Regions:
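N-terminal intrinsically disordered/low-complexity leader segments
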Residues: 1-8, 15, 19, 189-190
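Generic hydrophobic, amphipathic alpha-helix propensity
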Residues: 8-17, 34, 59-63, 67, ...
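Helix-turn-helix
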Residues: 12, 16, 20-54, 58
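Short coil/turn segments at alpha/beta junctions that flank glycine-rich nucleotide-binding fingerprints
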Residues: 23-27, 78, 99
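Hydrophobic alpha-helical connector segments
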Residues: 58, 72-98, 151
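Amphipathic alpha-helical packing segments from all-alpha helical-bundle domains
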Residues: 62-68, 72, 115-140, 145-149, ...
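C-terminal peripheral helix-coil segments that are non-catalytic and often amphipathic
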Residues: 94, 98, 130-138, 154, ...
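Amphipathic alpha-helical segments used for helix-helix packing
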Residues: 97-116, 160
C-alpha cells in the first residue's frame, strides 16, 4: 500500500519518475531505469508502489489535485471576473513553470493510464476544465468550453519552449498570456 502523500521518499521518487518519463517517455521507461535514477532499490520502489503505472498515476493525481486546490484557493475571493481569469492563468502557469517535467508527462501520457486510475484522473481533469469554463463564463467570455480548451492549449505546451531562467519569469509569462487571452476572449482587438 502506498505511503501517505507527503512521504519524503515517495515525493523524491515521484520527482525522479517525472524526470525520467519526461526524458524517455513512459512506455520506454522501465522500473530498472527508475531504480537507477532514484538510487532506490527495486524492492524499495515496490514498497511504495506496485508498478510503473502507479507512479504515473500518482504523478498525475498529485499535480491535478495540487493545481486545482491552488487555483480554487487563489480565485475564491477575487470578485472582478477578469482578475479571476488572470489569477487562474497566473497560478496555472506558475505551478507548471515550477513543475516542467510533470507538465510534459501530463501532456504526453494523458492516455497511458487504465481502469480506475484513468477514471480518477479524467474526473480531476474534468473538474479543472469546468472551473476554467466557469471562470471564463463569469468574465463574459464567448463559448466558454472552446475558450477553455484554447487557453489550456496556450498554457500547457510551455514546456516545449519556455525557460524559467530566460527573459520572462513565470509571473511575467503568466501575465503576458493572460493579457493575450483576455483581449481575445472578450472580443477585443490587438
Amino acid at each position: 500500500m502506498p505511503h501517505a502523500p507527503y512521504d519524503e521518499r515517495l515525493d523524491a521518487l515521484l520527482r525522479v519518475a517525472a524526470q525520467v518519463f519526461a526524458r524517455k517517455g513512459y512506455h520506454a521507461t522501465t522500473m530498472r531505469d527508475l531504480s537507477r535514477a532514484s538510487g532506490m532499490s527495486l524492492a524499495g520502489m515496490y514498497h511504495y508502489v506496485p508498478g510503473k503505472e502507479d507512479l504515473l498515476y500518482l504523478i498525475q493525481r498529485r499535480c491535478f489535485q495540487s493545481v486545482l486546490h491552488d487555483v480554487q484557493e487563489a480565485i475564491a475571493n477575487v470578485t472582478d471576473p477578469i482578475e479571476r481569469l488572470r489569477t487562474f492563468v497566473r497560478r496555472h502557469l506558475e505551478f507548471f513553470a515550477a513543475n516542467m517535467n510533470e507538465m510534459k508527462v501530463l501532456s504526453h501520457e494523458a492516455d497511458s493510464l487504465t481502469g480506475e486510475h484513468a477514471r480518477e484522473i479524467l474526473d480531476l481533469k474534468r473538474r479543472y476544465a469546468q472551473l476554467l469554463q466557469r471562470t471564463i463564463a463569469g468574465a463574459n467570455g464567448r463559448h466558454p468550453s472552446v475558450a477553455a480548451y484554447a487557453l489550456f492549449g496556450m498554457m500547457n505546451w510551455i514546456y516545449t519552449w519556455y525557460r524559467p531562467d530566460g527573459v520572462l519569469g513565470p509571473t511575467e509569462l503568466a501575465d503576458t498570456i493572460a493579457e493575450l487571452f483576455v483581449h481575445g476572449v472578450r472580443g477585443g482587438t490587438a
